[in-house]
């Protein structure tokens, strides 16, 4: 009987201690500069293999992860795939992300060249987001700054790619994932450049709109670089299309006279910002153009372009 008096308090202490340790482990911070990248978990990976991948690619303590995954009973539930960890803040988030059933996830594909509003419409259909809140966030300067982007809005920075997102992701979560993917791909491919990131993305968005074929992007880029170097108007049709209420099959002179800072028929230099979300090929082309003397180009009936060094030659190609 005397022993029983000590057993119950001891068990109570052990229970509370266990709860405390569990809570401490689940809320253990998981955050570092590398969380914005994608990491692939291979099919049939063991807990040990996954823990090593997380420790090698992210700042995750492999031993703490192994304890957490086993304590939650999820050591057999890790799902393979390509993950972005930007929304992960603690060990609980990490375990949930890696063990959530794919039925709780939605696969989305954002194609190159979509405008911000078109991305929002697409996400509303696929994920039932609050489209107004999403767009508001994309224009929220403090939120944009927190993402590491120096721009007035996120036009051009919602990276076109295929994503596997949890259904319960908030609008902020989705934006963070897309911008993180942009930054990762940009920093992996673009070294120091005479243009700023914002200028490169802005030019890339024009190239993305102009080019149907990737192999023409760097040559198209050279035309714009040559015109910028000569202080010529860019006269880029996509910048005019961007400011019109609806896209025109053919631009008329009256369209090119619309007074707007994005209109490169009226204002020299690059427009204030991107006009769509360019893909990595267009971004690379904007940063590293071909070397040429071309100043003009026009599309033929197959979507290819004819390039010229003189306006006279350009007019001839347009006929």
Regions found by a protein language model. Name each.
Residues 20-186:
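Signal peptide-directed extracytoplasmic domains
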Residues 1-6:
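Positively charged n-region of N-terminal signal peptides that target proteins for export
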Residues 9-23:
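Hydrophobic membrane-insertion alpha-helices, especially the h-region
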Residues 121, 125-132, 143-319:
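Bacterial extracytoplasmic/cell-wall-associated proteins, especially those involved in peptidoglycan
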